[in-house]
From Swiss-Prot:
HAMAP family: TolB. It comes from the Bacteria. Its main location: periplasm. Gene3D superfamilies: TolB, C-terminal domain, TolB, N-terminal domain. This is Tol-Pal system protein TolB. Residues 281-310 have a biased composition (Polar residues). Part of the Tol-Pal system, which plays a role in outer membrane invagination during cell division and is important for maintaining outer membrane integrity. SUPFAM superfamilies: TolB, N-terminal domain (SSF52964), Tricorn protease N-terminal domain (SSF69304). Pfam families: PD40, TolB_N. The gene is tolB. It comes from Cereibacter sphaeroides (strain ATCC 17023 / DSM 158 / JCM 6121 / CCUG 31486 / LMG 2827 / NBRC 12203 / NCIMB 8253 / ATH 2.4.1.).
Amino acid sequence: MTLFRTLAPMGLALALLLPAAVPAAAQQGPLRIQITEGVIEPLPFAVPDFVAENAGASELARDMARVIASDLSGTGLFREIPASAHISRVTSFEAPVAYGDWKAINAQALITGSVSASGDRVVVKFRLYDVFSDQPLGEGLQFAGSASGWRRMAHKVADVAYSRITGEGGYFDSRVVFVSESGPKNARAKRLAVMDYDGANVQYLTDSSSIVLAPRFSPTGDRILFTSYSTGFPRIYLMDVGSLATRGLAEQPGTMTFAPRFAPDGRTVAFSLEQGGNTDIYTLDTGSGTRRQLTNSPSIETAPSYSPDGSQIVFESDRSGGQQLYIMPAGGGEPRRISNGAGRYGTPVWSPRGDLIAFTKQHQGRFHIGVMRTDGSEERLLTASFLDEGPTWAPNGRVLMFTREGAGAGGQPALYSVDISGRNLKKVPLSVPASDPAWSPLLP
């Protein structure tokens, strides 16, 4: 039996490959990385260049294997064994695996694959092996799609491998919307852009005619909320990712709107509205235009973020005299403070898993990205810098991306990622200064 699932945006198709004599235990093999907060030794793995089934696939076969290896190595949980150490040379996707050769170089996981290309159509097949158990880890899979989507296919392979070995969801086949910046610090031009999670395939969504801030994906990834100063004052806008059609939301004379974020239903938007010197949190139904005020306080209340089930909102407020984090029911109600440490807290964002809240903290002249439980317990600071701010969660809720900016006139903003243990801090490779990242859900 073959199972197909069409992936409309990129024209990808997924199929199961059913090899002969796959052990029943292969679905639940012993190979497993247990993700904890302690120090771990990265799991050694090998990804030989995929087999090119025809001449037109040679370059793609090499490039796909490199992207897969980079995805896994970049997590800090895996360590690639370089090709120069390989004993076996994989020349056929269907050839038996020489487990002894891979054990000899201590490869605990092995990914093999093949690529065929015909015109604009590319087909990639792959299998994941638990080397020390002498068996496949799950069924083989096949992805098919256009040549322009080859990186997505590679990311999908890496997602499957990551998920099977760690038991956690992957996050490689995703995109990040961000603000691309240019010019001096005191006169920066800013425009919206999107990229693959690893910094590849940058595409610009707006020009630099007006300042844009705080983009946020919808739960389905097909729309983006953002704040623009196109009228001279901050206002929130909604953009369709496919057509780039844009419309204003919550427009009302004499007000400023900013810090928008979608509810999990994809229809409701929470945001801040400033009027007459007072800033409160509101919601807006993007279909009907119905607006509702959730807070009513003389303090500044902003940066709302929904819990994954949509029942609660975390936000920042200075109602206690300093900038702190609070949680309230999604329909409004009495908030409860969850941040209790020294310093100022802001930009809270709820993990897609629902277990943690990430935030920015300013304390003793330093900025930090941190996480805490939803009741405020177990606060952990993951980074420290002159300026770290604005965390966003990967789809699996185990990695954060944020903005880091250096001191002085020459300090340019850049995007960094870190896992929730604080171990794997990395700069996202971009050729332009960048800020305000927001991760998409996994692509369909």
